[in-house]
C-alpha cells in the first residue's frame, strides 16, 4: 500500500485520468473529491461490496 500525506487543497493523480483532492479535514473525517471519467466507477467501499454481493447473488427468480 502506498501511503501519502496531503494537505487540504492538495491533489494526487491515479493514472492520467483520475484525481483525488483533499477538500477538508474535520476531526477524524476527511472529505475528498474524486474526478474520474464516466466509464470509471467510484464508490465507497461498503457500497462497492454491496454491489458485488448483489451481482454474485444473481437475479432472483419468482416461483409462480
Swiss-Prot record:
SUPFAM superfamilies according to UniProt: CsrA-like
Instruction: Give a yes or no for keyword RNA-binding in this entry.
Output: yes
> Which GO molecular-function terms appear in the entry?
mRNA 5'-UTR binding
Q: Which residues form the signal peptide?
A: none
Q: Which UniProt keywords apply?
A: Activator, Cytoplasm, Repressor, RNA-binding, Translation regulation
Q: Please give the Pfam families that the UniProt record associates with this protein.
A: CsrA
GO biological process assignments: mRNA catabolic process; negative regulation of translational initiation; positive regulation of translational initiation; regulation of carbohydrate metabolic process
A cellular-component GO term for this protein = cytosol
| Compartment(s) | Cytoplasm
Q: How does it assemble?
A: Homodimer; the beta-strands of each monomer intercalate to form a hydrophobic core, while the alpha-helices form wings that extend away from the core.
The family assignment reads: Belongs to the CsrA/RsmA family.
Chain's role: A key translational regulator that binds mRNA to regulate translation initiation and/or mRNA stability. Mediates global changes in gene expression, shifting from rapid growth to stress survival by linking envelope stress, the stringent response and the catabolite repression systems. Usually binds in the 5'-UTR; binding at or near the Shine-Dalgarno sequence prevents ribosome-binding, repressing translation, binding elsewhere in the 5'-UTR can activate translation and/or stabilize the mRNA. Its function is antagonized by small RNA(s).
Per its record, how is this protein called by name?
A: Translational regulator CsrA
Its lineage reads: Bacteria, Pseudomonadati, Pseudomonadota, Gammaproteobacteria, Methylococcales
